A protein has these predicted regions:
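S-adenosyl-L-methionine-dependent methyltransferase catalytic module, highlighting the catalytic core
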Residues: 106-111, 118-211
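Class I SAM-dependent methyltransferase Rossmann-like catalytic core
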Residues: 2-13
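Class I SAM-dependent methyltransferase "Motif I" SAM/SAH-binding loop
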Residues: 35-37
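Short conserved loop adjoining the S-adenosyl-L-methionine
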Residues: 81-87
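Glycine-rich SAM-binding Motif I of class I
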Residues: 39-43
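Conserved alpha-helix/loop element of class I SAM-dependent methyltransferases that forms part
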Residues: 12-28
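A short SAM/SAH-binding and catalytic strip from SAM-dependent methyltransferases
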Residues: 92-104
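Class I SAM-dependent methyltransferase SAM/SAH-binding core
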Residues: 44-81
């Protein structure tokens, strides 16, 4: 009897930011997805790029979805670190919309580049002009399309701007290989490329340790 297969989702149906990330990942590579959610990205990479790997997730509902999709998943808290994985176990370590929600983001970046050759992260840009205007004119923490929760019930505890992230990378000897800045609908334009920290709502970075 033939082994069961998992149908690949149509490429157009993939969430736009995950679509961008998938283009950064080489075929036949090993991927660790931190905060993998329902496993959509890993399932897509497995079916379209023959990628192997694992997802780390804390939510039991998402873990069940990963299992149904045939995605290798481990239940864990990212703030506990990645000590279960050896150095250079993966080609890529991915973390989408999670960096700002962990207690120790700087330490986690180090761990990403310990277990992986390259890291990929995405996060909401707190330097976007709407966030700046909200604080300047209302004197309150912003609520926006990319930051929809009030300050008292948000999972985001370490919000940053593009400049903040790039400054941290420079301090840690991390080389940025690619950067894409998009709006809420994951579209980009020429003005955004000129003023990314002011006009970009979501940042996507691919990086590695300076050798």
């Amino acid at each position: 009897m033939a082994a069961p297969t998992h149908a690949a989702p149509p490429h157009a149906a993939l969430r736009p930011d995950l679509n961008i990330i998938s283009e950064w990942i080489a075929p036949d590579s090993r991927v660790l997805d931190l905060g993998c959610g329902d496993g959509t990205l890993l399932a897509h990479l497995r079916d379209t790029r023959q990628v192997s790997g694992y997802g780390l997730e804390i939510d039991s509902v998402n873990i069940a979805k990963c299992i149904r999709a045939g995605v290798n998943v481990i239940q864990t808290d990212l703030d506990a670190g990645l000590s279960d994985f050896d150095q250079a176990s993966f080609d890529y370590v991915v973390m989408t919309q999670t960096l700002q929600a962990v207690y120790y983001p700087a330490r986690l970046l180090d761990e990403m580049l310990r277990v992986g050759s390259e890291g990929i992260v995405t996060f909401p840009n707190f330097g976007h002009w709407r966030c700046r205007m909200h604080v300047a004119l209302r004197g309150r923490m912003p609520v926006s399309r990319t930051l929809p929760e009030e300050w008292y019930n948000t999972p985001n505890i370490h919000l940053c701007t593009l400049r903040d992230f790039e400054s941290l990378c420079a301090k840690k000897g991390i080389h940025i290989l690619q950067r894409t800045v998009v709006d809420y609908a994951h579209h980009s334009n020429f003005a955004m490329s000129l003023l990314p920290n002011l006009l970009g709502e979501i940042a996507l970075y691919r990086f590695q340790r300076i050798k």
